Amino acid sequence: MAGKPLLVSDDYPSSFEPDIYLSTYYSDPSPTPLLGDMMTFSLTQFQQAFASGQIKGRLIDFGTGPTITSVISASEHCESILLAEFSPQNRNILKQWQSGELKHSFAKFLDYALKLDGKGDSVADRESSMREKVSGIIPCDIRKENIFAPCFISSVDVITSSLCLESVARSIAEYESQAARLASVLRPGGHLVLFGCIGGSFYTVGSHRFSSFGMTSSELQAAWTKAGMKIITWKEGRRPNPEQKEESDTDGFFALVAKKA
């Protein structure tokens, strides 16, 4: 696999296999030798970001992929949720989830997030509430001026996003441009809650290797500051065995909460 070319954004519709992605990365959030506590870190940071109740309103989850884990905690504090995703096959998975037809289960992720909340909600009740709050599943492309074409979204109160921009950008300049484009969708005073990778160049789904543009912590923070976001919290973790590069060569991961000036 080492000699295979890296696939990029335009390859997703033809080559990204959501079923394999879900079974590889979203079967269980428990720490693994390869990813460490990446998934539990993500769930914990999203829960902590929304726990204060200060981040609320209308939410867009940008680059949702075939998963709903980014909005588990957000769903309790946001009145409506739009799921925006580039790949048609991933949007199809999200529609299957919303209708209750998806065979893959996110129950272990929901259970972990609900235990963090400590309110005693059941997995079934939370998932039902999430489905009801999803007001749409729409296409998006961060490379376009209107990133939600053919839809038009004026502004929202909250944007969440996980592992998205690094899979699109091919340079720091591109990442900065895309960060500014995404930030422009937020109303003044709106919040961004972001989870992503630090360093690296790829991740794998089945037999395919997809580009993941690696940036340092300081480069990432500078890009969002340049986009007009005031960083409120920044937290990061590291992969336990960075020498293992079968599925990914990223160095670590981060969570950012920021507010638009």
Language model features with spans:
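Core SAM-dependent methyltransferase catalytic element
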Residues: 227-261
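Short alpha-helix
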Residues: 119-126, 211-228
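S-adenosyl-L-methionine
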Residues: 98-149
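Class I SAM-dependent methyltransferase Rossmann-like catalytic core
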Residues: 2-56, 69
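A short SAM/SAH-binding and catalytic strip from SAM-dependent methyltransferases
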Residues: 143-144, 156-172
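Conserved class I S-adenosyl-L-methionine
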Residues: 54-67, 80-85
